[in-house]
Amino acid sequence: MNQCAKDITHEASSIPIDLQERYSHWKKNTKLLYDYLNTNSTKWPSLTCQFFPDLDTTSDEHRILLSSFTSSQKPEDETIYISKISTLGHIKWSSLNNFDMDEMEFKPENSTRFPSKHLVNDISIFFPNGECNRARYLPQNPDIIAGASSDGAIYIFDRTKHGSTRIRQSKISHPFETKLFGSHGVIQDVEAMDTSSADINEATSLAWNLQQEALLLSSHSNGQVQVWDIKQYSHENPIIDLPLVSINSDGTAVNDVTWMPTHDSLFAACTEGNAVSLLDLRTKKEKLQSNREKHDGGVNSCRFNYKNSLILASADSNGRLNLWDIRNMNKSPIATMEHGTSVSTLEWSPNFDTVLATAGQEDGLVKLWDTSCEETIFTHGGHMLGVNDISWDAHDPWLMCSVANDNSVHIWKPAGNLVGHS
């Protein structure tokens, strides 16, 4: 089961010796492995990360959505926040006159003014209750951010109302625009579920519909999948307690949900009971396709391919990665790969249709796969504890962000000669 790092202590002594040695070896080889690498250490680990779709071309500044996870030690520090980082793409590198023969690389002009080497916190939003398991911005309006909470609710925030001068105020008043919270729904699945644990419920994941603005999908540890329309929000009643649809799974926790990118009604869900299911918002209660025979140990993540939405990837706690043709999910996967240990999440590249990234929940590795040949093409080994989330950048095709339980936030780009980019 994906525990979201909640049983991990963050002391250096908790890091196994072999991982410390692996990190030391990795660090010595970073100049050969990366075209760009920026490592940051934060006060608290983040359970989520996502590059924003915008880019400041004058400074090559990227924005990243992150969170603070305190494991209930300091609830007042539980936040979602937006940080900025420049990858220095705007800097004009100097001529051969400034080629450094010792390091065998070009250096910028001495007069060049560099931006901060570290993440700069731009806006912080106090998370009102519980811990933020996953945060994602609305694709049609990135100022709107949804956070899945360990208290079972989904909180919706408006970034424009949380400037730096309002942080203190936001902690006093309600920082959220809308709260989505409903244990009952209008539709129930035909399969029974164990309701004895319904009082112990977390919102484990969420996903925005790319085709219908304001349509939000959420998964829950009590076995429910819920679909929300945040356009039901009103200033007088900011709490929406009735989802459009509430579907019970196979009786076990739902770990992840994802919309088909090219369709407004089809979505997939994966469960602790090893099920990967395809569902249709229009039918509301029937699974179109489902398979629970090809995974073990609980399926932690599932994602549709952006370029070919008939391909669905899923990964489980034993490290198995399956690729499905959703037209034949009752059959064997079209491809199977092994990450090695439990996979916390996976993400298809939005730029290359066969490239997929998996995040190791236990080994701390992010692996990039070429699924056309079912081979690993790059491994990021800079984290010393489990990786919680990963994100691809929309502007730089190979740029990634990854966050881990060792309080690290890494922004990195593999060397072109290793993955085949110029």
Swiss-Prot record:
One Pfam family cited in the UniProt record for this chain: WD40
InterPro entries noted in UniProt: Histone-bd_RBBP4-like_N (IPR022052), TIF_beta_prop-like (IPR013979), WD40/YVTN_repeat-like_dom_sf (IPR015943), WD40_repeat_CS (IPR019775), WD40_repeat_dom_sf (IPR036322), WD40_rpt (IPR001680), WD_repeat_RBAP46/RBAP48/MSI1 (IPR050459)
WD repeat copies, ranges: 127-158, 198-238, 249-289, 294-334, 338-379, 382-421
Subcellular location: Cytoplasm; Nucleus
The keyword DNA repair belongs to this UniProt entry's keyword annotation: yes
PROSITE patterns, per database record: WD_REPEATS_1, WD_REPEATS_2, WD_REPEATS_REGION
GO BP annotations listed: chromatin organization; chromatin remodeling; DNA repair; DNA replication; DNA replication-dependent chromatin assembly; regulation of DNA-templated transcription
Gene3D superfamilies: YVTN repeat-like/Quinoprotein amine dehydrogenase
Main location: cytoplasm
A GO CC term assigned to this protein in UniProt: nucleus
Alphabetized UniProt keyword annotations: cAMP, Chaperone, Chromatin regulator, Cytoplasm, DNA damage, DNA repair, DNA replication, Nucleus, Repeat, WD repeat
Main function: Acts as a component of the histone chaperone complex chromatin assembly factor 1 (CAF-1), which assembles histone octamers onto DNA during replication and repair. CAF-1 performs the first step of the nucleosome assembly process, bringing newly synthesized histones H3 and H4 to replicating DNA; histones H2A/H2B can bind to this chromatin precursor subsequent to DNA replication to complete the histone octamer. Plays a role in the maintenance of heterochromatin. Independently, MSI1 is involved in regulation of the RAS/cAMP pathway via sequestration of NPR1.
Subunit details: Component of chromatin assembly factor 1 (CAF-1), composed of MSI1/p50, CAC2/p60 and CAC1/p90. Interacts with protein kinase NPR1. Interacts with RTT106.
Note: Present with 149 molecules/cell in log phase SD medium.
Name the record gives this protein: Histone-binding protein MSI1
Native source organism of the sequence: Saccharomyces cerevisiae (strain ATCC 204508 / S288c) (Baker's yeast)
